[in-house]
Design a protein with these regions (language model features):
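C-terminal non-catalytic regions of proteins with extracellular/luminal or membrane-system context
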Residues: 1-254
Length: 254
């Protein structure tokens, strides 16, 4: 879904400004195509070809699967077939948040000549406001399942060292992208609930366990106070898991 013979895709305005999309949903014609396909009674998978978030609330409950392929290049069709037929186990993770409603994102005016945004966007905005996304930052499905355990964190010099165990509890070999997030105390200044500070890909056979390790430098946790970058003392929250919404949590004093 997403392209015709014209240089611009049908998801763009007839007179696009800088390539901005009119909205975050699929074009009406493509939603109609999904409706027609699901009416056949056969299993339907929707492969989204796009470079940013696409809202799926209107039709997600009617299809069997959704795959975000981004712009996969000339071998994208081959890659898609290999995933769908089980030759390759999917292991990708979303680099953005897919919201349930466009209003959950920062305000956007495609005709504005200038605009000022604050610090809150994506998963940091939704977590700050207590809004559940449709698909969280870092989300991604697999033909395997994974279990996390033994999250540990300690201060080592000018860094926090983090380790977490991840086990393949499924029946197929698969990769998992383990993500590490840090949440600052937020007493001296308002901070995000948590922010990504590292990720690591691990390859696991069925039943195999691996330890993912991260070293998070104190410099990456500083905030700007006037003309200096400060490290706020206090209790830092440490998270590790398969997405920003599915994490184990511990804490460490810095």
């Amino acid at each position: 879904l997403g392209a015709d013979k014209k240089p611009r895709g049908p998801s763009l305005s007839p007179t696009p400004i800088g390539g901005d999309r009119v909205g975050l949903t699929l074009p009406e014609a493509q939603v109609a195509l999904i409706r027609a396909a699901t009416a056949s009674g056969k299993p339907v998978l929707v492969a989204i070809v796009a470079g940013s978030a696409v809202l799926v609330e209107e039709w997600r409950g009617d299809v069997n699967a959704i795959l975000m392929s981004f712009y996969a290049g000339m071998e994208g069709g081959t890659a898609l077939a290999e995933v769908l037929f089980g030759d390759v186990c999917p292991s990708g993770k979303l680099p953005f948040t897919v919201a349930r409603d466009a209003a959950h994102y920062p305000f956007f005016d495609r005709d504005a000549e200038e605009i000022t945004y604050d610090l809150w966007h994506g998963y940091t905005k939704l977590e700050r406001e207590g809004i559940a996304p449709r698909y969280a930052f870092g989300h991604g499905l697999s033909y395997a399942t994974f279990a996390y355990s033994a999250l540990n964190a300690r201060v080592a010099g000018e860094a926090i060292e983090v380790s977490v165990a991840v086990r393949n509890t499924g029946d197929v070999a698969a990769d998992e992208v383990v993500q590490c997030y840090i949440g600052a105390p937020g007493v001296e200044a308002e901070r995000a609930v948590k922010q990504l500070r590292g990720f690591a890909r691990v390859s696991l056979a069925p039943g195999e366990t691996a330890i993912a390790r991260f070293t998070v430098a104190h410099d990456t946790m500083r905030w700007r106070a006037g003309r200096e970058w400060r490290l706020e003392p206090g209790t830092y929250r440490v998270y590790a898991g398969g997405s920003s919404a599915a994490c184990l949590q511990t804490s460490v004093e810095v």
